[in-house]
């Protein structure tokens, strides 16, 4: 832990011997989470709903780093599948130490374009977006995997994915923003509940990525001449570094939050 006068910095950030569950593992941000956990020494239960080929490519790129990365197909819209997957991980790995919930995104039809307004949208895609991001991407996995972590002697770490849109109005993405604001609030509430009532070493935090490309097709972000499209340009203009982030730039943050290096950090986004 961080309490000794002398410490091994490498050991402080190490996840050797631990098991991490990563949801949304076939996405760009989920892929960064898989890399982070594997490079830090954890075995990884990598959940995907689609994009198995991308996940297989990622696992091949990571190569042999002395850990097991096992893919599982899990539907984030199904609480029953998430619960069953928690049982599967316990069977296959014997325990859960880290959970990183990256599954989420906008459902088609849940956001309005420059030619529309919120009043032009159907209700169902907005409902599905909230279900995916708040429940399937956060609430249900926190319950399913968190229940398996309550008695861990060394505690554990749950890392949810919120978004900058939870705190800043981004044109068109109202349902998504509302869901991600819920993720941040849920994270804070769950952190207090788990630490006070179950295990003071069990921590819950969230990260709120800014402008990252994720798996968006290039034509959604760039014009044929390589310049940003208008929507992408607005995101870049609102970013102090004046560029999109690279998914691998999340690795350091995720390793910190997953490891003993952040043992006194909980309930933050």
Regions found by a protein language model. Name each.
Residues 11, 56, 114-116, 198, ...:
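A glycine/serine/threonine-rich, flexible loop-to-helix segment
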Residues 19, 26-27:
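Conserved glycine-rich cofactor-binding loop
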Residues 40-57:
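Conserved glycine-rich Rossmann-like NAD(P)H-binding loop of the short-chain dehydrogenase/reductase
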Residues 119-139, 159, 176, 183, ...:
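Catalytic Tyr-X3-Lys loop
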Residues 142, 179, 187:
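Active-site helix of classical SDR
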Residues 163:
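Residue(s) in the substrate-gating loop at a strand-loop-helix junction
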Residues 198-203, 265-267:
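Short, small/polar-rich loop/turn modules that mediate ligand/substrate recognition or access, typified
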Residues 243-269:
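C-terminal substrate-recognition "lid" of short-chain dehydrogenase/reductases
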């Amino acid at each position: 832990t961080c309490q000794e006068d002398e410490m091994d910095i490498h050991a402080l950030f190490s996840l050797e011997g631990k098991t991490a569950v990563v949801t949304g593992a076939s996405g760009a941000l989920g892929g960064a989470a898989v890399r982070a956990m594997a490079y830090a020494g954890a075995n990884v239960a990598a959940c995907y709903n689609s994009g198995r080929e991308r996940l297989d490519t990622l696992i091949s790129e990571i190569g042999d780093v002395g850990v097991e990365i096992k893919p599982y197909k899990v539907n984030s819209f199904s609480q029953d599948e998430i619960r069953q997957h928690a049982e599967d991980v316990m069977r296959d790995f014997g325990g859960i130490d880290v959970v990183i919930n990256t599954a989420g995104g906008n459902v088609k039809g849940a956001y309005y374009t420059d030619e529309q307004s919120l009043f032009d949208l159907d209700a169902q895609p907005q409902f599905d977006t909230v279900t995916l991001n708040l429940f399937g991407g956060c609430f249900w996995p926190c319950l399913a995997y968190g229940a398996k972590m309550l008695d861990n002697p060394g505690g554990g770490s749950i890392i949810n994915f919120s978004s900058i849109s939870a705190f800043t109005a981004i044109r068109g993405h109202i349902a998504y923003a509302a869901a991600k604001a819920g993720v941040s609030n849920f994270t804070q509430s769950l952190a207090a509940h788990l630490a006070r009532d179950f295990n003071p070493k069990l921590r819950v935090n969230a990260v709120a990525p800014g402008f990252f490309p994720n798996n968006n097709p290039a034509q959604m972000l760039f014009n044929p001449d390589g310049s940003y499209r208008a929507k992408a340009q607005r995101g870049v203009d609102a970013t102090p570094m004046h560029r999109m982030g690279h998914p691998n730039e999340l690795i350091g943050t995720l390793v910190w939050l997953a490891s003993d290096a952040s043992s006194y950090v909980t309930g933050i986004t």
